[in-house]
Amino acid sequence: RFAWQHKLEPFDYWYAAEAASFSSLRDRAIAYGAFGGTPRYLAAIDSGSTLAENIQRLLLAKDGEVRALLETALDQEDGLRDTAKYRTILRAVAGGATERNEIANRSGLTNDRGLRDKLDTLIELGYLERRDNVDAQPNDAVRYAIADPALRFHQRFVEPNRSLLERQSAAQLWDAKVE
């Protein structure tokens, strides 16, 4: 029986930039900021389209392939229950809450062991990362951040503009909010 499991890590910037196949260094950097290093997201990029067209089609459009993958990622995690709370935590962190107390206040969740366990789970799954200062003391507050660039882009531009995306095209949102 095959029981070995290995978590596939996303590409770093160098390999993701090669996979994105844009010629300008600026476009490669922006592509990494929008799509991250997840090979599945990078594979959806159409090399015959501009960076703006790819972001609009894959991340901003209602039926965008990468957008759909990001929006359903938590639902596909084995053994993860009550995904609404995890989404609320991600939304709070993306909105600027970086410490556990801030996350609890912004998300409406209780700052207890349950929240800490959820934060640890999101770190283990690769959605969040823990950031400590170089000179942090053991009792200093831990800071959290969205770990994946594609999820960060989604939380920054798609989530807060859902109603706008229902009324306008992805190109209009791109022009008004992203570019």
Q: What are the language-model segments listed below?
A:
Residues 17, 32, 102-105:
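The alpha-helix within a helix-turn-helix
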Residues 25-44, 97:
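The conserved phosphate-sensing helix
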Residues 41, 45-179:
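Accessory nucleic acid-recognition modules appended to NTPase machines
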Residues 3-30:
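Conserved small helical "lid"/interfacial subdomain of P-loop NTPases
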Residues 1, 10, 38, 149:
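A short beta-strand-to-loop transition that corresponds to the Sensor-1 phosphate-sensing loop
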Residues 1, 19, 43-45:
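Short, conserved acidic/polar surface loops in the N-terminal third of protein domains
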